[in-house]
Design a protein with these regions (language model features):
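Acyl-CoA-dependent O-acyltransferases
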Residues: 167, 184-238, 242, 246
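Sparse, context-dependent recognition of short Cys/His-centered cofactor- or disulfide-binding micro-motifs
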Residues: 4, 32-36, 41, 146, ...
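Active/ligand-binding-proximal structured segments within catalytic/core domains
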Residues: 1-18, 61-64, 232-245
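Short, hydrophobic beta-strand segments
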Residues: 1, 45-47, 221-225
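Charge-rich, well-structured scaffold segments of protease-associated domains
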Residues: 14-200, 246
Length: 246
C-alpha cells in the first residue's frame, strides 16, 4: 500500500506526480532469505529508488514521506487499491502460469516457499479475493495492521542503507540521508510500537494436491520436493542448475 495511499502532505495522485518528476519511481518489496542449515527464513522489507544526483535530496524526502507519513484510513481508496491489486495479480498469474504453479507447489514444502507464494503468488491472490469480497468486515483489521507494522519495521536498529553513486556525488547522498535519519528519529519517538505484543509468525506448511481451472489454453503441472536431507547437494550446484533451467 505504500506509495498508493495519501500521505499527510500529498494526495496519492500528487505523490505519484512528485515521485515521477524527481525520480525513476519509489518502490517497495518483501525479500525472503533462507538461513543456511536451517528451515527458518528472514524477511526483509526493501524500499528502493533511482534518481539523478541533483535530485537525490527531493527523492529521499519523498521516500521518507512514503515510509513515515502514509495514511491508511481512507477506506474508499483503500478498497480501490485492494480491488486493483487483485485484478493486476490475476492477469500476472494467468500470463505466467508455470511460475504460479511452481510457487504454489513449493508453498507446501518449505517455509520460504510458503512466504513467497503468500506474498506474490496464488496464496496472496486468495487473500486478496477474501479481502475484496469481505472488505467491510476486514477493513479495520487491515488498517490497524498496516499502522502497527510500519511502526515495528521502520526502526534505526533494523535499517541498512546502501547507495550506488560516483564518489563526487556521495556528499549529496550523505546530506540527504542526514535529513532522512532525523525524520526516522522523529517517527520512532512519536510512534512507539508495543513490540512485546508481536509474535513471530510460523506458517503452517502442509503438502497439498490442488488443481485450478482457468480459461488458458496451456495446462501446467508442478511437482515439488526438498533435497535438504540428501547428502552432497549443498555445494551450490543445484543453485546453478536452477538458473540454467529457469
Amino acid at each position: 500500500l505504500l506509495g498508493y495511499m495519501d500521505t499527510t502532505e500529498h494526495t496519492f495522485r500528487e505523490f505519484d506526480t512528485e515521485t515521477n518528476f524527481y525520480s525513476g519511481g519509489i518502490g517497495s518489496d518483501l525479500n525472503i532469505y533462507s538461513l543456511y542449515n536451517s528451515e527458518d527464513v528472514e524477511l526483509k522489507f526493501d524500499v528502493k529508488t533511482k534518481t539523478l544526483a541533483g535530485r537525490i535530496k527531493d527523492t529521499v524526502r519523498l521516500m521518507a514521506e512514503m515510509m513515515f507519513k502514509t495514511v491508511f484510513t481512507d477506506e474508499k481508496h483503500l478498497r480501490e487499491v485492494v480491488a486493483e491489486t487483485r485484478s493486476r495479480l490475476k492477469v500476472r498469474l494467468m500470463s505466467a502460469g508455470h511460475q504460479a504453479a511452481v510457487s504454489y507447489s513449493m508453498a507446501g514444502i518449505t517455509v520460504d516457499g510458503w512466504y513467497n507464494d503468500y506474498s506474490m503468488g496464488i496464496g496472496y491472490y486468495d487473500y486478496l479475493v477474501k479481502l475484496d469480497e469481505n472488505f467491510d468486515g476486514e477493513k479495520e483489521k487491515l488498517i490497524k495492521g498496516c499502522e502497527e507494522l510500519v511502526k515495528a519495521m521502520f526502526k534505526k536498529e533494523n535499517m541498512l542503507i546502501s547507495c550506488t553513486r560516483d564518489d563526487e556525488d556521495y556528499a549529496k547522498f550523505e546530506e540527504a540521508m542526514s535529513s532522512f535519519i532525523g525524520k526516522l528519529d522523529d517517527f520512532e519517538k512519536k510512534n512507539k510500537a508495543d513490540v512485546s505484543t508481536l509474535e513471530k509468525y510460523r506458517p503452517d506448511v502442509k503438502y497439498r494436491k490442488t488443481a485450478f481451472s482457468t480459461p488458458a489454453e496451456i495446462q501446467y503441472a508442478a511437482v515439488s520436493g526438498s533435497y535438504k536431507d540428501v547428502p552432497d547437494v549443498n555445494d551450490g550446484a543445484m543453485t546453478v542448475t536452477r538458473h540454467l533451467l529457469s
